[in-house]
Amino acid sequence: MNGIVVGLLPGVLWMVAVIFAVSIITITVSRGHLFTPKRRRPPVDPVDWSMVKTHFMSFAAALIPFPVLTFTADLMNARMLAFYDHAQLPGAIIIFALVLLELIAMYLQARNASETEMDRRLGVASHRNKDDIK
């Protein structure tokens, strides 16, 4: 029983990291209105520092399964170890792509927030100029 739990631990940790990354991407896409056309996009807030900190936690969670696999490999049976040997590279590529997508989504949200702030300031300036003309 103990060998089964140890054998499943790297896979479970990897799945937690994937869920963590997908949730960060989903929240960022939602808050940043990334798929809303610019003319219909509501005001976008800048990326919260809590999301940036969560991204670093996600990055750490993405790294954890690989050393856990290395340290627990002696306690696993041969079939489980062979599975992880075959799944390790694709798993690393998937988690790397998800962490990279987190960064891209946060960048796009920050860009949309910058456009919102520019529109807000330029809108105030254009109204101020119209008031000066009257």
State what each model feature region is.
Residues 1-9, 78-87:
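Membrane-helix interface and helix-disruption motif detector
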Residues 60-85:
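Alpha-helical transmembrane segments and their membrane-interface junctions
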Residues 84-129:
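Alpha-helical transmembrane segments and their immediate juxtamembrane interface regions
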Residues 46-64:
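Interfacial helix-start motif at the membrane-water boundary
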Residues 13-24, 55-61, 117-134:
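Alpha-helical transmembrane segments of integral membrane proteins, especially early/N-terminal helices
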Residues 18-39, 107-112:
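Membrane-water interface of transmembrane alpha-helices
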Residues 1-9, 29-48:
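Hydrophobic alpha-helical transmembrane segments
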Residues 3-22, 93-96:
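Alpha-helical transmembrane segments
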